[in-house]
Each structure stands twice: as C-alpha cells, then as structure tokens.
UniProtKB/Swiss-Prot annotation:
Family, similarity comment: Belongs to the DadA oxidoreductase family.
One MF annotation (Gene Ontology) recorded for this entry: D-amino-acid dehydrogenase activity
Gene Ontology CC: cytoplasm; plasma membrane
Catalytic activity: a D-alpha-amino acid + A + H2O = a 2-oxocarboxylate + AH2 + NH4(+)
Species this protein is from: Brucella anthropi (strain ATCC 49188 / DSM 6882 / CCUG 24695 / JCM 21032 / LMG 3331 / NBRC 15819 / NCTC 12168 / Alc 37) (Ochrobactrum anthropi)
Enzyme Commission number(s): 1.4.99.-
Lineage: Bacteria, Pseudomonadati, Pseudomonadota, Alphaproteobacteria, Hyphomicrobiales
Entry protein name: D-amino acid dehydrogenase
Length: 416
C-alpha cells in the first residue's frame, strides 16, 4: 500500500521504518527542513520503560496547588483563553484516582517495555548509533517522604516483571560515582537496571537514512493544511505543495494532531505540555553522570550523552508557546549544579519543546472510525521511550498483522 505519514519526529520516522520493512511504499511529510527538529530535538534522553508513570496521579491536584507558590516548581500552569486547555485539565483531574492510575500506568508500561525490546532488536539489525548507553536509570529522592511513597510504583513494577533496586545513599553512589561527593543532598533512590539512554535527535536522523534505504521518501518544508474527505473517507492531504494522496494516512503530529483531525469529527484530547532542556559539554568527567539520574524534587532528568550532559524536564501548561524564560533555565542549572557540576553551563544551549500529552498519559495508537486514517500521537514525556514499539505496533495494525501486545485499549475510541 501507499502510506503517507504526517510528521517526521521520532514517532513518524519509526512508523515509516517499520511500514517500509513490511513492504509498503511510504512517504513522510513535515513542515521542518529535516527529521526531529521539534519535540524530538533535545529531550531528556532516557529510554525508561519502568518510569512510565501517568502525570495524572493520586495527590497531584494537591501537589500542583503547592507548586504554584514555589520558585523552582516542576509544574507551571499558565491559564489561557483557550477552552480546550480547561477541558483537558478537567479530564486529567478525572484520571487522578487510584483505580485510573493503575490502569493507565499498566498500559503505559506495556507499551514502553515492548518499545524497549523493539529498540534492542532494531539496534541489533541495523547497528544504529546515537550516543546510547545501557547502564540503567536512577530516580533520586532528596526527601525521605519521596522514598517512602514509591510503594504503588513498585507494586506495578513487580506485577509487570520489571527489575528494580531500591538503593540507599551508598548504593546510589556506587552506580553513579559522582554522587559520592554530594551524599548529603539525597536519601536514596530507585534504580531500573534495564533502562537505557541515548540522543533521540541522532537516533531519528540515523533511522531516517536507514528508512530511505528501504524506499521511504521524505518531503520536508511542506506545510500540512487539512485532510480532504470524499465518499466517507480521507481522499488526500492538502499541503503547501498541492494535494497528496495515498491508500492510508498516519497522523503523527504530536500536539498538532487534534487540530488536523478535528475536521473529521475526531476528538483527540492531546494538549501541549512544554518541557525544557539544556545541553552542556562535559569538562569534568568525575562530576558527570554515568547514565540518567532523575531528580524527583524538580522532575528533571540529568543524562550523559557522549561528551555532553543533557538536563531536561519540568512541565508547563501554557498553550503552544515555545519561549525560553530565564526562570526555567535557572531551575535546570540549579538541579545539575547541585548534583553533577561537571558540565560547562556557560557553553550550554537552552531549548524548549511541546510534549503531546493526553489526559490519561497513554498515547493514541491505532485506527479511527475512518478505515484509511490512523493516529500515532500523544506520547507525552515518553515519545522517545515508546517510539519503536509504537511504530511497530501501528505498522502491524495497518498491515492486518496480529500485534505483539494488546492494543485495543490504546486507540482514539476510548475518548469517544
């Protein structure tokens, strides 16, 4: 079949790769001048299935209210005049119950674990390089109450068979030696030894080249305007370079997915949650991380990417703005300087991206009520983690193959 994929982030490119492997003729369309130049460009860098947890969780409403008054809050809410923002927030609050949290986390871990396995297989098949490290990730707790409160997460990890280690200060310093100098800054950690790290931008660009070798065509610098309907199905995509037609269409536009599919009467409750990152060259190896360390207090990930440190995180609900406030940079600087002062922050680059978040934190992967339209979007903070699994899963669904994991609860139908 001829398949057009809208979006060349890590989700769009992985989907293209797996569809091409199954023999389809694939074209990827994007407004940017190359792959992974928006949300996939400078994310935190971890591939962390075990940390696949919903933002909508019990206690979050109370925490969010408290964070409103903190200088270095991990969550910032900036109200807009957009009613979609309020609708999305209300749906998110409805998912902040124990029962919904368990359902959503189980779905997320299922996709994320599968995606990690797909990434391992892809790496073996292609030899792809992207500053990857397979040395686990460490969630670091500065306060005892944080460490005491991981019971629900551990319960789900056990149920899903995800290996983990609860570490004291000495254990944390053993896996991340630079922490030995700052043991007074934390009380313990939760380590997931099977998690990985890597540069999502490098991966996406390398995979795009591999996909081109399989026949995938990329059309960059093309603005996507609308989906055209005829005879009860989509007949084409109106773009700045004319109408593009195919047998099947995949919408992988992240936060911009809802606007495109709204004309089809589809409700995709994906809203942008802005994240920030800085990337600094390493100047002191002894004070740099080995892998990824998640600073639980600030919701920030500090990751080793080759000879660089990537510091990313936080969440800002403020619409589609991509500005770079100095206060957000200050929070990133504070976290990394406190724990891993091995990077040259004066030479760091500062970036922001719009994470496409659903109210239940679970991505939308699968068919729509239109036979020839599919969605692969809404991965939130886990687009990199879930990318390979999401791409392979959707490629199988489009091709009529039985998927390797359960997929019936991942589609857009759960919102209709």
């Amino acid at each position: 079949m001829q398949i057009t994929i809208l979006g060349s982030g890590v989700i769009g490119v992985t989907t293209a790769y797996y569809l091409a492997k199954l023999g389809h003729e694939v074209t990827v369309v994007d407004r940017e001048e190359g792959p992974a130049l928006e949300t996939s460009f400078a994310n935190a860098g971890q591939v962390s299935p075990g940390y696949a947890s919903p933002w909508a969780a019990p206690g979050i409403p109370f925490k969010a209210a408290k964070w409103l008054f903190q200088k270095h809050a991990p969550l910032v809410l900036r109200p807009t005049c957009d009613p979609v923002q309020y609708s999305w927030l209300l749906q998110m609050l409805a998912n902040c119950t124990d029962s919904r949290y368990k359902v959503n986390k189980t779905r997320m871990v299922r996709v994320a674990e599968y995606a990690r396995d797909c990434l391992v297989d892809l790496r073996k098949e292609t030899g792809i390089e992207y500053d990857q490290r397979m040395q686990g990730t460490l969630q670091l707790f500065r306060e005892q109450y944080q460490l005491d409160g991981i019971g629900k997460d551990i319960e789900v990890l056990r149920q899903d068979g995800v290996p983990f280690e609860v570490l004291d200060r000495e254990g944390c310093a053993k896996v991340e030696p630079a922490l030995a100098r700052v043991k007074d800054k934390f009380v313990g950690g939760l380590r997931l030894p099977h998690d990985e790290t890597g540069d999502c931008f490098k991966f996406t660009n390398a995979l795009a080249k591999i996909a081109e070798g399989l026949g995938v065509k990329f059309r960059f610098g093309v603005n996507i305007k609308s989906l055209l309907m005829s005879g009860g199905k989509v007949s084409g995509v109106e773009t700045s370079e004319g109408v593009l037609t195919a047998d099947r269409y995949v919408v992988a536009l992240g936060s911009y997915t809802p606007a495109l599919v709204k004309s089809l009467g589809l409700n995709a409750p994906i809203y942008p949650v802005k994240g920030y990152s800085i990337t600094a060259p390493i100047v002191d190896e002894d004070r740099a991380p080995v892998s990824t360390v998640l600073d639980e207090s600030y919701k920030i990930a500090i990751t080793r990417l080759g000879d660089r440190i990537r510091v990313g995180g936080m969440a800002e609900v403020s619409g589609f703005t991509t500005d770079l406030p100095a206060a957000r940079r200050a929070t990133l600087d504070l976290s990394v300087t406190d724990l891993f002062p091995g990077g040259d922050l004066k030479a760091a680059t500062f970036w922001s991206g719009l994470r496409p978040m659903t109210p239940d934190s679970t991505p939308i992967i699968g068919a729509t009520r239109y036979d020839n339209v599919f969605i692969n979007a809404g991965h939130g903070t886990l687009g990199w983690t879930m990318s390979c699994g999401s791409g392979k899963l959707l490629a199988d669904l489009i091709s009529g193959n039985k998927p390797d994991i359960r997929a019936d609860d991942l589609g857009i139908s759960r919102y209709e």
